[in-house]
């Protein structure tokens, strides 16, 4: 595609990669920060990777810290959930289906990848609808989908459950480990150790939720947030808007991603989720138990709920010794401060989940380190 030519979506992305505009935003950020210390946190794995790829941490003023938060769904999945999925793989005849990132995440003593190598039937799928096809092709075998993700992926899981009901695929079920973003942000805003001055809010999540669910950051904590896109100018604009609010003493929920996010989000997708799921308490790696931060399958769809259908013994949870993934996820440290980072823990040989996922902060720091 020629430079400046609009993409198929009709959006000309060259403006969001304009080096002159990026330089102007960087200069403005440096001017605003001055000799202040400002802590901003991104809570989206795609932002984490983009910030690393574009080298933004190294060109920001010394007083501006860009911290990575709990934006990677694989990373925040508790060991107990991974152990439970592995236990389900031991059911006679079971087929476990999962997104690829979950395969190498270490549980207490093993991983889905190791169990696959040992002979368990564990398959990578690119959509939960692929798991439905597998269930249809194997009517006498239980097919369990490992459901992990935030608001962006949950509607597709809800749609898959409704489709399973319509197709009469009673051998299909979902192990639901889905989480919602705002309660985790509240936990971080309440944490005095992190002292976050502003949040770079996730553009993908906000396409579903809209802006309103983040309003508590302003109302309860007087902390600004800006929904941000993923191109260089998007991210710099979001940072600039946040820094300006911090410096001027204001707080609001801004939108620097108007081409992708509107104030109301996607009500149809939310209605689909509410039809199939209900809020529940769940445990986040690094943040611990958080009330109403998870989703469970409603009783009327319990026949598709792997937790309800299968009573399996799950091993006692053991966390990897020395791994500080939890501290990374809540922004208490950067990945390079973990004693295992780049030594015993690398993308090729991960000790903790933060080094496994393509959206994890640890591989992003490892790949784009100076």
Q: Whereabouts are the PLM-identified features?
A:
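Short catalytic-loop micro-motif centered on adjacent basic/acidic residues
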Residues: 40-42, 123, 144-147, 173-175, ...
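Short beta->alpha junction loops/turns
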Residues: 45, 150, 231-232
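Internal helical hairpin/lid segments
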Residues: 237-327
């Amino acid at each position: 595609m020629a430079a400046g030519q609009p993409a198929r979506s009709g959006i000309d992305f060259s403006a969001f990669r304009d080096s002159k505009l990026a330089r102007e935003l960087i200069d403005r950020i440096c001017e605003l920060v001055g000799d202040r210390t400002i802590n901003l946190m991104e809570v989206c794995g795609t932002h984490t990777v983009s910030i690393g790829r574009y080298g933004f941490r190294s060109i920001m003023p010394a007083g501006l810290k860009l911290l990575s938060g709990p934006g990677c769904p694989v990373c925040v999945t508790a060991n107990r959930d991974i152990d439970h999925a592995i236990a389900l793989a031991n059911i006679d005849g079971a087929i476990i289906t999962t997104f690829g990132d979950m395969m190498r995440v270490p549980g207490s003593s093993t991983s889905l990848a190791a169990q696959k190598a040992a002979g368990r039937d564990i398959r990578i799928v690119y959509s939960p609808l692929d798991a439905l096809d597998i269930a249809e092709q194997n009517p006498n075998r239980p097919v369990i989908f490992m459901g992990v993700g935030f608001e962006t992926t949950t509607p597709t899981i809800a749609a898959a459950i409704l489709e399973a009901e319509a197709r009469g695929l009673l051998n299909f079920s979902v192990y639901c480990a889905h989480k919602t973003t705002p309660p985790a942000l509240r936990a971080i805003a309440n944490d005095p150790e992190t002292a976050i001055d502003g949040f770079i809010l996730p553009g993908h999540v906000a396409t579903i939720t809209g802006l309103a669910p983040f309003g508590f950051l302003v109302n309860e904590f007087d902390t600004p947030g800006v929904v941000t896109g993923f191109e260089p100018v998007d991210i710099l604009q979001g940072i600039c808007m946040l820094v300006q609010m911090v410096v001027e003493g204001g707080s609001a929920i801004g939108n620097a991603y108007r081409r992708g996010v509107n104030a109301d989000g996607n009500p149809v997708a939310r209605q689909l989720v509410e039809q199939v799921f209900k809020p529940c308490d769940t445990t986040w790696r690094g943040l611990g138990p958080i009330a109403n931060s998870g989703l469970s399958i409603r009783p009327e769809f319990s026949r598709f709920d792997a937790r309800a259908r299968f009573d399996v013994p799950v091993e006692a949870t053991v966390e990897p010794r020395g791994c500080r993934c939890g501290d990374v996820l809540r922004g208490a440290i950067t990945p390079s401060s973990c004693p295992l980072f780049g030594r015993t823990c690398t993308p090729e040989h991960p000790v903790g989940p933060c080094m496994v996922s393509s959206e994890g902060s640890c591989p992003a720091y490892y790949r784009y380190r100076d």
